Amino acid sequence: MDITIPITAQGRLSTVNQFEEIVLRANADGSLIRMRDVARVSLEASSYTTESGINGGNAAVLGIYMLPGANAMDVAEKVKETMEEISKNFPEGLQYEIPFDITTYISESIHEVYKTLFEALVLVIIVVFLSLQSWRATVIPIVAVPISLIGTFGFMLIFGFSLNMLTLLGLILAIGIVVDDAIVVVENVERIMEEEKLSPYEATKKAMDGLTGALIATSMVLAAVFVPVSFLSGITGQLYRQFSVTIAVSVILSTVVALTLSPVMCSLILKPTDPNKPKNRVFTFINKWLAIGNTKYVAGIKRVVKHPRRVIVGFGIVIICIFMFHRLVPTSFLPTEDQGFFTVELELPEGTTLERTREVTDRAVAFLMKDPSVEYVQNVTGSSPRVGTSQARSQLTVILKEWKQRDDTTIGQIMQDVQDELKQYPECKVYLSTPPVIPGLGTSGGFEMQLEARGDATYDDLVRATDTLMYYASQRKEFAGLSTSLQAEIPQLYFDVDRDKVKLSGVPMADVFSTMKAYTGSVYVNDFNMFNRIYRVYIQAEAPYREHRDNIGLYFVRGSDGDMIPLTSLGTTDYTTGPGSIKRFNMFNTSIIRGTAANDASSGQVMEILEQIAREKLPSNIGVEWSGLSYQEKQAGGQTGAIIALVFLFVFLFLAALYESWSIPIAVLISLPVAVLGAYAGVALCGLENDTYFQIGLVMLIGLAAKNAILIVEFAKEEVDNGKDLVEAALHAAHLRFRPILMTSLAFILGMVPMVIATGPGSASRQAIGTGVFFGMIVAVTVGILLVPFFFVMIYKAKNKLKTKKLINKT
């Protein structure tokens, strides 16, 4: 029977023994020279340029990053499930740990926000109850909270927003706002029931006739302030957009509730007050305090109206103070958070061996592990995020214990202790940094500047410019941990090839360089199979034969006559220095300057100082650009004034369209700067910075202050239109609106207290938003509501004078 049989042979080698048996030469006497006779064959790692470990032991570090659009919490959960399943098949002695998980900070931060949300809700309920002094009345505005929040969740789903830090912070602010409209409705209904002895149904009907327009106007204005900021571009626009949509939707839904459900509940739940029923002492005290406050408030307005010049001068001082605070309050992009870890970079002199770097790294790890606040220390020796692979660098990631386990020790205190210890190491420089506030924007927190060699600037010019900038910046106390990525003087051995000799010897030039590379570095020659995978085969000289300059004399190439020629006869060697690598940014050779601001300085201040040094000390062909978070901060830095101006413009245009008049919008807007001054004064008092979160709170504050002003101005306008005296109308409106404005403002202010005193993960963000709004609303409710009636009177008088002048001119 005829059959077909395939012929097979040995393919790729797969064992050390097979490689050792490779025949290199057959001698005339019949002997063979095999690979094992001239070389050591072993399974080794593909690279020895870096080492990694954890808590002083060896470890393979695996970083897992999520793709854009993925949910961090879901990814982390699935990774943990997968690792748990894979670990069942690990060989004995091999185990895994997850020392670093950024989602731990995210989940803890969200937990703290939930806690703040609950605290704010409790405080708002208490304020509402003490203000309305009846559980029946309290239920009506409180019902607006879950309805508004649940409805907001639905719209967040439609817009594709997740439940993250920004949206949750927006919901915290919303809690103090969504009850406002319902409180105004309930207070007005109860006042009419008491004063006019009407039934709940009739009182509700009459109250809504006078309130509907004001409620719609106030809520629309509060939503309108977020319209311009929603269209900002970049990272800042994303931050504003999620926050603004959350607030705007919750406010609009609360207004819908106040116009529909709240009146129905008022007519069904509220009951007339029994005059014979004994008064609660607490409520009696509160009512007495409110009555005295109302009387003094109206009296204060009378005095203010009688001295317009003093008020206008004072208002001018307010405007000047705002500009002063705007220049004096330090700026930054986002507040620095305690994310539960920080990095330490050790920089030894260039040319240091990996073994020496490992020794210093082990000492640093041993010290860090003694700190009771430290849980893990992960090290990558021979690498740095600032310069890449370098045997003279080592990066340590210090993962701290959970926030509750650290007592009162802050990450700043821990980093200072580490800095004080490691700076005593004479053999290295130490750089400490926190992670970027927004993962992915830069490799670390702090600032990141790019010095660029433009035009005719050479690499040497860039080196000199970098040294100049580093020198002058290091003289300033505002900087901490200043460093550069420039590696300009790495020790090198230069081999000067005598090309004439090479040609005369008949040696191909490529053989000279390939031989040197094979001995001193490594050369990839083939592949081998193992564990059903393909691995590479490299050749390299043993360590003793590549340690010294003289070893080059042991490297031979074959000449055209068959003789072996040492490389030292084909060239000379000389020690020199040069760059290890040259980085480029926007097509220019660049030097990256990184660092952090000292405790008493902000990132905005140090960025201005660096720009000033660059202008004054560097040549014109050296350019400056910002990257990472610094670029975003620079882009957002000039937006504060423009954002406030746009918000004021939108409020003016909206009110002008709503009331078909320019007088009411001006009367409302001109009373708002005092609230802005209060916000700036608050952050300055608390040592905070003018960052994006503060600006978000500022936009919110303008809307809230405008809302209070509209409640007074809108009612005063109706009184004037009905023929009442201008001043009397303003006083009457202020008298009637004092209690609801005070109640709603107190509810919001106390709702901000948990944010102002926030601690734990994510506390810096909560403080940044809450502090400015908290102090701004206090000033708005104490000083601002005095100015609203005053400016209403002044604007209307000016309006009437213009009308009279026009009539005289016509006649």
Spans of features found by a protein language model:
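Surface-exposed amphipathic alpha-helical segments in non-transmembrane regions
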Residues: T8-S47, A70, D74-Y96, L328, ...
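Hydrophobic transmembrane alpha-helices and their membrane-interface caps
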Residues: Q95, V122-S131, W135-R191, F231, ...
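Hydrophobic alpha-helical segments
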Residues: G176, A207-G210, A217-P278
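Transmembrane helices with small-residue packing motifs
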Residues: A26, F161, V229-L239, I312-T352, ...
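Juxtamembrane "pre-transmembrane" interface segments
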Residues: D37-R40, E51-I126, G210, P228, ...
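Signature of alpha-helical transmembrane segments and their immediate interfacial
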Residues: L211, R281-P335, H735
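Helix-loop junctions and hydrophobic alpha-helical segments within the transmembrane domains
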Residues: P99, I106, I110, V186, ...
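Hydrophobic alpha-helical transmembrane segments of membrane transport and translocation systems
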Residues: T260-M265, G760-T811
